[in-house]
Amino acid sequence: VKLATDRLITQLHLRVESAKAGHDMKYEQFDFESKVLHHQEHIQRYLDGQHPIPLNIEIDLTNACNHRCSFCVWATYIGEVRATLPLGIVISTLDELKALGTKSINWTGGGEPVLYKGFYEALDYSYQLGLENGLITNFSLIREEHDDQILEQLLWARVSMAGGLREQYREIQGVDDFDKVIANLKRISEKRRVQQSKLTLGIAMLVKPGNLHSVPDMVELASDIGLDYLQLREDMFISPPEKAWWKKQVIPVFNRAEKRAEEIGLKLLGAKYIDTQEYLNLPSKCHAHHFVLGINAEGYVAFCKNTRDNPDFYIGDLRKETFSNIWEESLKKREMESSINPISCATFCKNMGINKAIEDVVQCNITLPLVDPEPPVHVNFL
């Protein structure tokens, strides 16, 4: 218990000292373990058994997608279930979420959010409610007439690009939209500079054997465009052979990329996962759904955002009942809260960072509030 307490307090103090020294954090907005600890009132309500609504909701507006990424974890699901969430359900659910205490919305997929006919209407409605908004997109469908809305109403946009060269991009994403995406990024980046928009704009590159050699090109590209960051990340469902390849082949490339990024002033970020079985054995249960949750394009609310393609994890249907009723009354939710054990989850599950942080607080019987340093960037997105 003492070790866990020391680790928790030290973690918060290190962030304070790092901020004072002006050091960049390696993960920053992708360090979910640190971010969740800044929501101490929410954590306390959860520990008191009040079942607070998730702070961050991921919404799949549609399963339609104009790309065919070879690494897409939802490919089979969105190919078989061509669903689109009715705009009326989106609007009414946003009203509920805001009233109940949700702070932020991830517009994601599923499919490509911008393909959804009512995307900009939904984004505007969410923004006018006072919710923070982020977008995960391939950025190929961004039209100039919507630039000003994007710059004003999105807190961040993360663009999925599978290669720093056209050929690798085409092979992995299944379409030849490389030039189109680059043009959109350059246009938005320049307008952002002129308008002094607070939009954070970056690229996330899932590194695979087929695109590893284009990492240096991606570093140069991201810098030339003027992006805030480049995130290089592994597949959360990485296999044991791929882990060995990662350590032997990828890490040296990353080290060289990091050195080059420092030279040209580009922020190079990783993806912070719990990657050892040791930590999967730690949580007594999964805490994450009280902090982040997923809604799929069929209207199902999933117990875990990573299982929104799996009916076994659906706790309710927004086409039949309200979110608040699902959250308060779902028998499936109660059953899963008592039965789900993280030891059976993937080691690279992003929710494990949240679980680890909350379990530290639970095991140590720590009285909140703890140290409250300057909050990390995009603290409401978990």
Where are the predicted features?
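Radical SAM enzyme core and accessory elements
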Residues: V1-H51, E298-Y300, D312-F313, L318-N325, ...
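C-terminal accessory region of radical SAM enzymes
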Residues: H13, A19, E190-K198, K247-L280, ...
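Short cysteine clusters
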Residues: C65, C69-C72, C286, C304, ...
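Secreted/processed peptides and extracellular or luminal domains of membrane proteins
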Residues: F71, A75-I78, V292, N310, ...
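Conserved C-terminal portion of the radical SAM core fold
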Residues: L100-T108, Y127-I136, L155-M161, D179-I274, ...
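Short, small/polar residue-rich loop motifs at catalytic or cofactor-binding pockets
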Residues: C286-H289, D312
